[in-house]
Amino acid sequence: MAEAKVVFLHGLHQRIVEAIISFNPAGFTTLVVDGKTAEAPQLEAVKDADFIMVFRARLSDQVLRAATQARLVQLLSAGYDSINLKLLRELNIPCANNGGANSRAVADHAVLAMLSLYRRVIAADRAVKDGRWAAAIDGMNSFEMADKVVGVLGFGNIGQKVARRVQAFDASVQYYDKYPLSPERERALNVRRVSLEELFRTSDIVSCHAPLTADTHHIVNAQRLALMKPTALIINTCRGPVVDEAALVEALQQKRIAGAGIDVFEQEPVDPGNPLLTLDNVVLSPHSAGTTWDTWFRRADFAYKNMRRVWDGQPPQAVATDYDL
């Protein structure tokens, strides 16, 4: 019986690549291709590929069209905004994300940002190292999570894990999602769905966990930021363009909201002139929320099992369905 051919297009360290392809199952062969190379090697590699596995490599339309035998594009990421889903639909090739494999890491990071802002961890660290001891903490500028309302924008795998984590700190959770949970599921998670406007108006923290689509582009805009409490925080660990960055900078500069935890930016790597870099009421990280050593094993395990499902004639799991990008 013929082996299934997987082409792995990536922009990763070799040690990570080796960890991922160690999950290659019997009956599969994986061809590793540097996703940062010229297009020609990619075109040659995919022409007889059964599966294309991708991380940190942008698939051009030409490469997708060349993959005439492909049964699935399998992403190792949660987001799918870098893939032309409309073209894949025309080509009848499904695209799957990582099935929540990095959801724990992203949820951890989102809560880390909340706590860092509330407890002024970065300012306190800097003060102690500078010999100013407790200069950053005056007894009036640090806060607890308990009894706060956390509004989760986008309530999929990551959003639901954020809910569980903040509830452990005795915060309550409300959410907005295009696709509401069943009443039974809401009761089980102890959450309630609210309108977008209510989410921004009544939350102490708004944490963004939506995919980037036409609907969610700049869903956090000047009008919605204006609804927020002056004591509120906004956290973004999903995709930069979900937040109108210029509007956010203005709200932060004018102290119309208290702070922001930002892992993703409209331009990445971030422009050295980005005003966010100059503000002391923000905590920033380099799109690293989902990138832990632990996640690679879950990503790889899910990806190869999903490709195996398709090879065995079953439908793939975690298929992206938003084609309005």
Segments and roles (model prediction):
Residues A2-A96, N221:
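An N-terminal-biased, well-structured beta-alpha scaffold segment characteristic
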Residues F55, L76-S77, P94-R104, L196-E197, ...:
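Short beta->alpha connector loops at strand-helix junctions that form conserved
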Residues V63, K178-P275:
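Rossmann-like adenosine-cofactor binding region
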Residues L91-I93, G99-V149, R164, P183, ...:
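Phosphate-binding beta-alpha-beta segment of Rossmann-like dinucleotide-binding domains, i.e.
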Residues C95, A222, T231, T237-L325:
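Rossmann-like dinucleotide-binding domain for NAD(H)/NADP(H)
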Residues F155-G156:
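Glycine-rich Rossmann-fold phosphate-binding loop(s) that bind the pyrophosphate
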Residues G159-Q160:
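N-terminal Rossmann-fold NAD(P) dinucleotide-binding loop
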Residues Q174:
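Conserved beta-strand positions in the Rossmann-like core of class I SAM-dependent methyltransferases
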